[in-house]
């Protein structure tokens, strides 16, 4: 009787934890979910060479998380969510690490980490939908930041430029995976300080370092730029009327 009651309790407990979700763990020691945390309408895969540690009172909702190699740590009261239940947010950790500090809300469409990349996001930071983080080296985002919609943060060229013969050879070998990368592209780390506001449709590209209390205006692109603290950055647009 006690065994049956315990099994029923466990079944109900995990159904609540993983409401409408598929969770596949290849490494039993590599997955921990804290008190009061839930995974809703999501898909999670943790490979043999990976780990996924979720703190207390976290919410993961409408997300697909695939961790092939590396570690993902979600601290207490953090939220990973998409407002689009059908088109879920994608978190792909092919090889690298991803750390979200406490009381942070991420609504990115995609986070993609490869080639041993590292992404760390501080506390009380919000990233809105449509945004994307790609790391093949290092992206460090501080605390109390507001990152708007459709913002791209890439520390990588994402692709290596080959001669046409080499790219054709790779395409044939790895078909149907077009654009397959066999070596790490050019990269340079990104740092965003604390209390920054990154405007809608901005692009923070490789090699950019942003200090504290910086505002980046709408549709601004930063590549290999150093922005000192307490600055305002806008894209220079020259309007011509012909």
Task: Kindly label every feature range from the protein language model.
Residues 1-155, 160-161, 169-178, 182-213, ...:
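Domain-scale signature associated with acetyltransferase and cell-envelope carbohydrate enzymes
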């Amino acid at each position: 009787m006690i065994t049956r009651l315990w099994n029923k309790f466990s079944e109900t407990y995990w159904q609540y934890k993983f409401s409408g979700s598929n969770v596949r763990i290849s490494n039993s020691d590599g997955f921990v979910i804290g008190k009061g945390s839930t995974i809703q309408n999501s898909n999670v895969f943790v490979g043999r060479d990976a780990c996924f540690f979720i703190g207390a009172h976290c919410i993961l909702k409408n997300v697909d998380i695939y961790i092939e190699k590396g570690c993902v740590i979600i601290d207490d009261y953090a939220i990973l969510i998409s407002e689009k239940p059908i088109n879920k947010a994608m978190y792909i950790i092919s090889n690298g690490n991803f750390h979200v500090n406490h009381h942070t809300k991420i609504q990115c469409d995609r986070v993609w980490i490869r080639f041993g990349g590292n992404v760390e996001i501080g506390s009380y930071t919000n990233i809105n939908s449509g945004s994307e983080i790609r790391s093949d080296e290092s992206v460090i985002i501080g605390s109390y930041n507001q990152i708007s919609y459709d913002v791209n943060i890439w520390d990588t060229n994402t692709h290596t430029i080959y001669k046409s013969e080499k790219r054709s050879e790779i395409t044939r070998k790895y078909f149907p995976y077009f654009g397959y990368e066999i070596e790490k592209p050019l990269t340079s780390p990104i740092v965003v300080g604390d209390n920054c506001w990154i405007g809608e449709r901005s692009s923070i590209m490789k090699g950019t370092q942003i200090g504290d209390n910086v505002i980046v205006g709408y549709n601004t692109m930063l590549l290999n730029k150093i922005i000192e603290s307490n600055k305002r950055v806008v894209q220079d647009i020259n309007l011509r009327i012909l």
